[in-house]
């Protein structure tokens, strides 16, 4: 009986392992999810009609005409007349709609404005090491979402899935990146990965949003390569690493087939670090330049 139970458990474990999706299947699923995030979900990135980035002390007013979803825009003039007024003071966001206060919890979830129009806000880094808020206006009929043809990736190539040695940086210093909006954004250099690809030894820095080892559950590389601006997005691409357990890992798996473009490749409403680190290869893996792919 005991042996039978062990065999049954072992078979179940084998079947679970056997049923685990292959890397290429995960990649395909990720592309489908990315298409949804860009254009299909209620708060899809390409449904953003306007954005306001607030530093402490800033005020923004949402102007527009009822019944005209495309008319809603933010005004930095505190004297402007509009349906929504947002202020950030001492790190606290306050919002009023037609003069009535909006609950703080609603700001991060959904503030209805008009047919097909709502507003959502979240804390974000508005300058290097400076926290503020980002407020988006979503329009369900926004043309960019309607005309979206889907993301385009190079065909999956298992050669671009590599095992890498990770060397942590004990100091985890801050590094400031220029962004697509002309501002600065701060990340922490948490270490370097070393791997071999196409016969070349490559070292690539890794960055995280925190320098506290207890809070580091993932990190990313912002890289350029020989295809940057020549079939791959001109400001570089990103690749994320997670599922390594406790930081720091000794080795990690990097699948460059999952390398993706920053949101800024398709929308001006995000602040994305411009990649500075180089891979001296033509990386025919990951997402293509959206401006030339279709």
Model region roles, listed by residue range:
Residues 126-187:
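Surface-exposed beta-loop interaction hotspot
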Residues 165-227:
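Flexible, glycine-rich surface segments
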Residues 17-25:
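Bacterial Sec-dependent signal peptides at the C-terminal "C-region" and cleavage site
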Residues 222-258:
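Acidic, glycine-rich flexible loop segments
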Residues 8-15:
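Bacterial N-terminal signal peptides
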């Amino acid at each position: 009986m005991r042996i039978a139970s062990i065999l049954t458990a072992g078979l179940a474990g084998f079947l679970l392992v056997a049923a685990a999706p292959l890397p290429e299947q995960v990649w395909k699923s990720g592309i489908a999810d990315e298409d949804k995030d860009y254009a299909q979900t209620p708060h899809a990135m390409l449904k953003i009609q306007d954005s306001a980035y607030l530093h402490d002390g800033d005020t923004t007013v949402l102007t527009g005409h009822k019944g005209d979803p495309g008319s809603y825009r933010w005004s930095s003039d505190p004297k402007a007349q509009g349906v929504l007024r947002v202020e950030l003071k001492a790190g606290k966001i306050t919002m009023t709609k037609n003069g009535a206060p909006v609950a703080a919890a609603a700001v991060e979830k959904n503030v209805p404005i008009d047919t097909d129009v709502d507003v959502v806000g979240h804390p974000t880094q508005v300058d290097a090491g400076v926290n503020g808020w980002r407020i988006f206006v979503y329009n369900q009929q926004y043309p960019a979402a309607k005309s979206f043809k889907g993301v385009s990736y190079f065909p999956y190539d298992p050669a671009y899935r590599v095992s890498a040695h990770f060397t942590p940086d004990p100091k985890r210093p801050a590094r400031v990146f220029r962004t697509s909006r002309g501002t600065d954004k701060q990340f922490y250099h948490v270490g370097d990965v070393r791997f071999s690809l196409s016969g070349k030894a490559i070292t690539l820095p890794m960055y995280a949003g925190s320098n506290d080892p207890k809070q580091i559950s993932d990190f990313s590389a912002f890289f350029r390569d020989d295809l940057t601006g020549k079939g791959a997005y001109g400001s570089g691409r990103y690749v994320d690493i997670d599922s390594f357990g406790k930081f720091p890992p000794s080795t990690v798996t990097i699948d460059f087939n999952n390398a993706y473009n920053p949101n800024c490749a398709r929308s001006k409403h995000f602040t994305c670090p411009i990649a500075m680190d180089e891979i001296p290869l033509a990386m025919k893996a990951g997402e293509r330049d959206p401006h030339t792919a279709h």
